[in-house]
A protein has these predicted regions:
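Helix-loop-beta hinge of the Bergerat
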Residues: 2-31
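Glycine-rich/acidic phosphate-handling loop/turn and adjacent ATP-lid/helix
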Residues: 72-103
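Short helix-loop "hinge" at the ATP-lid/N-box region of the Bergerat-fold HATPase_c
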Residues: 48-52
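A conserved short beta-strand within the histidine kinase catalytic ATPase domain
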Residues: 58-66
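Conserved short strand/loop->alpha-helix "switch" segment adjacent to the catalytic nucleotide/phosphoryl-transfer site
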Residues: 20-42, 100-102
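Flexible, glycine-/charge-rich segments associated with ATP-binding catalytic modules
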Residues: 1-4, 8, 112-135
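Conserved polar catalytic motif of the HATPase_c/GHKL fold
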Residues: 42-47, 113
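Glycine-rich phosphate-binding loop
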Residues: 100-115
Length: 135
């Protein structure tokens, strides 16, 4: 699995997007799949930037792998920030109006809808969120 390590900062979002885009292009991902993956990658990475390290700077790692036998891309997001399982929270109720709905949860709901698989684990002091999209 190829890995990109970087300071978790908003300024590095484009580096993350380019890293994943390169893998998708090499694997022959369609424009639709590329757009869906880019949205999910942005949402997850921005959440790491904003919430993983409340006391300051921290590092993030993005691992990316494509599989030609079963055409898919697997992307892992790792950080050593505050332990947080975004999948443990109940999905946002999108049938409610914006005023009635509690704040938060729409981004991870969007990721779950766009990706084919989304899993989370906390191992060796790291949050590991894995997304899979079939090509």
């Amino acid at each position: 699995m190829k890995e990109l390590r970087l300071q978790a900062s908003a300024e590095r979002l484009e580096d993350v997007q380019e890293f994943v885009r390169g893998k998708l292009e090499a694997a022959g991902g369609s424009l639709k799949v590329m757009s869906q993956v880019e949205i999910a990658v942005e949402e997850i990475y921005v959440n790491i930037v904003h919430y993983a390290y409340p006391s300051g700077d921290g590092e993030a790692a993005i691992r990316c792998e494509t599989d030609r036998e079963v055409p898919k891309i697997t992307i892992q997001f790792l950080d050593a920030g505050t332990p947080f399982d975004p999948l443990a929270k109940e999905d946002a109720d999108i049938s409610l109006s914006a005023e009635e709905r509690s704040i938060g949860g729409l981004g991870i709901l969007m990721v779950k809808k766009l990706m084919d698989e989304v899993t989370y684990c906390y191992e060796e002091g790291k949050n590991i969120l894995t997304i899979v999209k079939y090509l």
